[in-house]
UniProtKB/Swiss-Prot annotation:
The modification Proline amide is found at P63. Keywords: Amidation, Disulfide bond, Ion channel impairing toxin, Knottin, Secreted, Signal, Toxin. Residues 22-29 form a propeptide. Coiled coil: none annotated. This is U1-theraphotoxin-Cg1d 2.
Length: 66
């Protein structure tokens, strides 16, 4: 009984993550979204995001950000 309850709890999120990763790979997006790694030289952030110099990942672009 416990195992049959755990299967949907852990199995379905794994299935969704796997399908999401496959879709991302298929689109071949050339820019990074929120919290994707970037360096500003070879990898860039998409529109609406900036590459954080401290953390080296894409963050939301805010007006007045230094």
């Amino acid at each position: 009984m416990k195992m049959s309850a755990l299967f949907p709890i852990f199995g379905l999120p794994l299935l969704f993550c796997n399908s999401f990763a496959a879709e991302l790979k298929a689109t071949g997006r050339g820019c990074g979204g929120l919290m994707d790694g970037c360096d500003g030289k070879s990898t860039f952030c998409c529109s609406g995001f900036n590459c954080s110099p401290t953390w080296k990942w894409c963050v939301y672009a805010r007006p007045g950000r230094r």
